[in-house]
Design a protein with these regions (language model features):
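Short, well-ordered coil/turn segments that N-cap beta-strands
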Residues: 1-2, 29-31, 63-69, 131-136, ...
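Boundary/entry segment of secreted carbohydrate-active catalytic domains
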Residues: 1-14
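Conserved, mostly hydrophobic/aromatic
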Residues: 4, 25, 33, 62, ...
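Aromatic-lined substrate-binding rim segments of carbohydrate-active enzymes
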Residues: 18-99, 122-126, 228-236
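Aromatic-rich peripheral "rim/lid" segments of glycoside hydrolase catalytic domains that contact
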Residues: 82, 92-94, 155, 340-349
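Polysaccharide-binding and catalytic clefts of secreted carbohydrate-active enzymes
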Residues: 96-264, 268-282
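Hydrophobic targeting/anchoring helices
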Residues: 100, 243-349
């Protein structure tokens, strides 16, 4: 597979640009494009009002040129109406402050209304495009991660703890709560470990037992959201493979557990300036290893710069080719990029 992440909704008013993009993709021998990763607000600009004609047009044109679609579900970037109407969808940070609308990947995974609205848009997409001849695979959400410290998450965490430990005596023993007088006598006494309680700095804890269990709970909670979307598209398109893009040595999620619910592994390779070829190789090996050595998909890499580094080193000539060949040598069935056309503004321009 050869292609990359394509966000044509940025140029719907410029059909000449879209036509030129497809011409150049075809000329480059590309055979797939990832669509719709951040398109929820374009699909559903107002609650219950859906617009898919533009995506039909793009998929039709890509398919006519021998380019298949990896169709993403857009749950990683919520529309403004969702946050305005249902503020409980907005994540609460480690200081207890509920975030405003903005950024991406900052929703509360425990909010029932978030899961409900995600289910609506995902089912709409599956019904609308499940039979399209150009549909190659489903790409669920995008780079899952993040933590929320709201009341919904706190209640869900207590339920998770009850299921794991059964009794407070067992929990207190496992966490060694008698030290520093942390012993719990009621389940409702347990609060989330954050910067208001057990944490100091962002990722350091005074009370490791509760922090480790919260991270396990969080990984499973996010996995539940992924599985909800996985099952939704599988119910409509059982023969279309499903994946989500992982992130190498990302500590927040238990990728070994996640691999059980992915038809194949895909991941995004964005080396930091200091990462050696050996470190990149080890990331590839981890991604291949979590699903028994099966080949994986390199879903994203950047031919230019990344948005999260404070500065980016200039790539030496040939480095992009070397990174691509290295991925294939370690078992990747693809060489793919982000983005096919660079944005003219905002974060990832």
């Amino acid at each position: 597979m050869h292609g990359g992440d394509y966000n044509p909704e940025q140029w719907l008013d410029r059909p000449d640009i879209l036509e030129e993009d497809i011409r150049m993709m075809k000329k480059a021998g590309m055979n797939c494009a990832t669509l719709g990763v951040f398109s929820w607000s374009t699909y559903e600009p107002r609650e219950g009002e859906f617009h898919f004609a533009w995506l039909h047009d793009i998929m039709d044109k890509l398919y006519a040129n021998g380019i298949y679609t990896i169709l993403a579900t857009p749950s990683g970037a919520r529309p403004a109406w969702l946050d305005e109407t249902y503020p409980e969808c907005r994540r609460v940070d480690s200081y207890g402050v509920r975030e405003h609308h903005g950024v991406r990947h900052n929703h509360c995974m425990s909010a029932p209304v978030y899961r409900k609205k995600v289910s609506v848009i995902v089912n709409k997409l599956a019904d609308e495009f499940g039979n399209h001849p150009g549909l190659l695979m489903w790409h669920i959400s995008n780079e899952y991660g993040g933590e929320c410290y709201c009341e919904n998450c706190e209640k869900a965490f207590r339920v998770w703890l009850k299921e794991k430990y059964k009794t407070l005596d067992a929990l207190n023993k496992a966490w060694n709560t008698r030290f520093w007088g942390h012993t719990f006598y009621e389940w409702d006494e347990i609060v989330l470990p954050d910067l208001r309680s057990e944490h100091f700095e962002y990722d350091r804890s005074q009370f490791q037992g509760i922090t480790l269990d919260y991270k396990r709970f969080n990984s499973e909670s996010i996995l539940e959201c992924y599985k909800q979307e996985y099952e939704a598209v599988k119910s409509v398109t059982p023969d279309i493979p499903v994946t989500t893009n992982l992130m190498g040595f990302f500590k927040m999620l238990d990728y070994k557990m996640w691999a059980k619910y992915m038809d194949f592994i895909s991941w995004d390779n964005y080396p930091a300036n200091e990462d050696s070829p050996a470190m990149i190789a080890m990331n590839h090996e981890l991604m291949r290893g979590i699903k028994g050595g099966q080949p994986f998909i390199l879903m994203e890499q950047t031919p230019s710069v990344t948005n999260w580094l404070p500065y980016n080193a200039l790539k030496r000539p040939g480095v992009m080719r070397l990174w691509s060949y290295q991925a294939v040598a370690h078992g990747s069935d693809s060489v793919m990029f982000f983005q096919m056309r660079r944005s003219v503004g905002a974060c990832e321009k």
